[in-house]
Amino acid sequence: MLRWNEESSQAQAAALTRPAVSASAKVEAICKTILAKVKEQGDDALLDMAKEFDNRANPRLRVPLDEINASEQALSAELKYAIDTAYANVKCFHEAQLPKDIKLSTQPGVVCELKYQAIEAVGIYVPGGSAPLPSSVIMQGVLAQLSGAKTVVLATPVQGDKAINPAILYAAKLCGITTLIESGGAGAIAAMAYGTESVPKVNKIFGPGNSFVTMAKQLVAQTVPGMAIDMPAGPSEVLVIADERANPEFIAADLLSQAEHGADSQVILLCNSESIIEQTQQALTRQLAKLSRKETAEQALANSSLILVDSIAQAFDVSAQYGPEHLILQLADSTPYLDKVKNAGSVFVGDYTPESAGDYASGTNHVLPTYGYSASYSSLNLLDFFRTYTVQTITKSGLTQLSKAILPLANAEGLDAHANAVSIRLEAIKNEQ
């Protein structure tokens, strides 16, 4: 336990310091080699890498449409219900975010518009691993579907002789995704960035991944004209603010649900009760012993802090300084504090709002800024799948009046041609009279 007010500023900073995350020069070099190979060789490069990295004897790239359509037959009723519910809730929440164009007159004869346009082609990356991640498909695929993007490509790795898990295929089917690519890592990112014989080129790439995926996304965003990515990625994290009436078992469960993500995850508790912190420590020990990913969670807890603060108000100040990906509020009454929330990716209010709900099915998005980026980045939302452009229409009388602002500014900035583009029109208007 760390007593916040008794610690030096250096110790306080250390308690909020995240595990170092830095891509090695080796990772960057490998990614550059992979990107170049895919750019030059297309599908052949992807198939070669599937054999080399994924141990696939007879790899393929595109998943046939009939496999996607038949996927639900392989699901249990329980899992199908879960995916259907998550899809419906995420769609409901994000559908309300559909943007509306703006059109107004800034002054007589001057009309300005803001128009929203779906990004035409988007790529979604879904990591592989020991278990399928249909929730990752839903959190990104629903938004692509609602935006009306013309092309949506989903890439996910396949190991050995396995096929893409039917839960992934079914989630993709619900989201209207028909272009599924059996490819992972930096190669998949390169394929979506450059395009190959089987993989359409996209304009923006979404989705988490390992250090190779993260580096590849950064590289294509820097080198491929017009390419964008969603947001910087980092280890998962949660910060819990709790008071003296909070449930220590609930707190421990929430902390461990993040700690099990990875050894580089970080969890922090800010509480004004020494007794609750001590009980939480005991609950962590009990619950940790039952976890299948106990070793991973233990390593994450080594990077974590249980902090005693003087007041809940102070806890919010410390939280704002940290900028958590997930912020959980276990307070007798959170209402007075909601406006004090700063720099948090997503907030979970009350004893019965576990972070797991947002990860899967409440309706909010689980793609969130980590590593302190919540101070400047937002959770993934529908606007991330749109671009905007502006329109202005000016009448003769409108330009005549507006020229009184344009000409002095153009002259002050020494841009004669700018001024002339207005003056020549004013002269034409004068000659018409």
UniProtKB/Swiss-Prot annotation:
Its EC number is 1.1.1.23. Keywords: Amino-acid biosynthesis, Histidine biosynthesis, Metal-binding, NAD, Oxidoreductase, Zinc. The keyword Oxidoreductase applies. The active site is at residues 325-326. Its cofactor is Zn(2+). It comes from the Bacteria. This is Histidinol dehydrogenase. It comes from Pseudoalteromonas translucida (strain TAC 125). The gene is hisD.
